[in-house]
Amino acid sequence: MNTQQRHSWGLAFGLCLITLAVNLQAPLYTTYAQLSGYGAAATAVAFSGYVLGVLPVLLAFGGLADRVGRKPLILAALGLSMLATVVTMLWPNLIALGVARLLMGVGTGLASATSTAYMMELMPTCDARSPANRVTASTSLGFGLGAALTSLFLLALPSVTPGSFWLQLMLAALALVVVWRLPDPAERIKHAPLLRLPVFPSGSLPYSFSMLLAWATSGLVIAILPSVLAAHDLQQWSGLSTFTVISCGLVFQPWVRRMHPARATGLGLLVLPLSYALLAWGASEGSLPAVLLGALGASSACYGFLYLGGLSAITAMAGAQKARVTAGFFLFAYVGFSIPVVVTGLLADHFGADVALIVFGLALLAGASITGLLIVRTAAFIAQPSHG
């Protein structure tokens, strides 16, 4: 392995450990809520602390890496991931979870603002997709792996501070050393603008809204599903469902890359409501195979068809404003990761989990149908020959 490859894998290791901490506590959400005396809505609010951390950093400090360099932001993100884990180890309750999610949101925002650019500088190549694919793979694996590890430790020994927390701290400390030794070749620009407001090119909104639907579904699986599974004594498996709904989407990405963006997004909007229906039915009936199969289908849509298809489409529309257009795309995604999840939690507290899951499913079906129709019409209009 040459030096460039070694450096790129070192950065990928650091990025994986940053995102591994994000959903590390997911299988314990219901336990934290019970210990704190709160319900599904409060759990969803604590879960959304992540978005409150990540969005301001992405928007208000998007140009920070140009001023201070790439490596300091990755090191800061690793430190915040460790601090967030320590907070929930010392105070295993819902308020501490909200604080930890906020810290992890800030850390992920710092890493997201520079990770792809840093990877491209460490592994120079004619094909810009290779660095981006390595960043996507390492972060997607981390997002799901943390929850899966906690589930495995809980199956072996129930605890509010499982061994996965200690494992994350040890691996993140190792990642700090690895990233510290990486070069940082980017030129510093002292007066680079920090603020990068989002831009939405004509025709991009349906693709952005499809990401809102996708991440709302994955957020529901992470934040609300554990309490539904707990009613059937399946809470310890919620980490596996989180891993499935996030990380298994990687399997579908090579296929999606060969598809036209509009076709990929349209297929994702078809798969998502069907997969959610199976997942919600399995959770209500206590059928773990149905939950995992539905989560796998949702993952193919959320982190395969809709993510790559939508990102490819809006990037093609962006022109010279790629960074700001991408910020707008993820703004929709993070709104979906918070507001619909909180609303569903409120419905679950007042009307029961089954009603909340049905209402979310109907809204998802309506949103996917309308968005899919808009994408099909936009694609058909663009494909028409000009008669100017």
Where are these regions (language model features)?
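Conserved MFS/SLC helix-loop-helix module at the cytosolic interface between two early adjacent transmembrane helices
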Residues: 55-94
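Cytoplasmic helix-loop-helix junction between adjacent transmembrane helices
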Residues: 100-139
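A late C-terminal transmembrane helix in Major Facilitator Superfamily
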Residues: 311-363
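Helix-breaking motifs and short loop linkers at transmembrane-helix boundaries and internal kinks
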Residues: 37, 69, 90-96, 282-286
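C-terminal transmembrane helical hairpin of 12-TM major facilitator-type secondary transporters
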Residues: 263-310
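Helix-loop-helix hairpin linking two adjacent transmembrane segments in secondary transporters
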Residues: 125-180
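Symmetry-related core transmembrane helices of the 12-TM Major Facilitator Superfamily/SLC fold
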Residues: 163-179, 357-374
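Central cavity-lining transmembrane alpha-helices of secondary-active solute carriers
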Residues: 45-62, 112, 116, 243-255
